[in-house]
Amino acid sequence: MKYLQGQHILILGLGSSGLAMTRWCAQMGAELTVADTRESPANLQVLKSELPEVQFKSGPFVANLIEGTSVRAVFTSPGLSPIETLPVIEAAKAMGLWVGGELSLFVQALENLKATRDY
């Protein structure tokens, strides 16, 4: 079972962790948007090549990345400053969205295995 199937996910940061989370969420059937403060992060070409359906946004991490959208979860790369991501994280929490990172994706994957396959 793909527990993220059809869910719109926002990934903050396109470093190694952000790319890994994006790949995982795509495998799970999520609709994805990736945001990075850099206009052309090093992994942007990899993202476009491997996952051309993923939307990329550059610029500051602001609340309108999620407000008025269908985003249901926000995952943050661990290398990002919490101060930098705060506007998006606060808005996501206020909207009741799932907020996390690589570890929370891993934990949820294990919970899904336990629920669906008695793992």
Predicted regions and their residues:
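Nucleotide donor/acceptor-binding cores
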Residues: Q7, R117-Y119
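Conserved adenylate-forming
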Residues: A109-R117
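N-terminal leader/targeting and accessory segments in enzymes
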Residues: M1-Q108
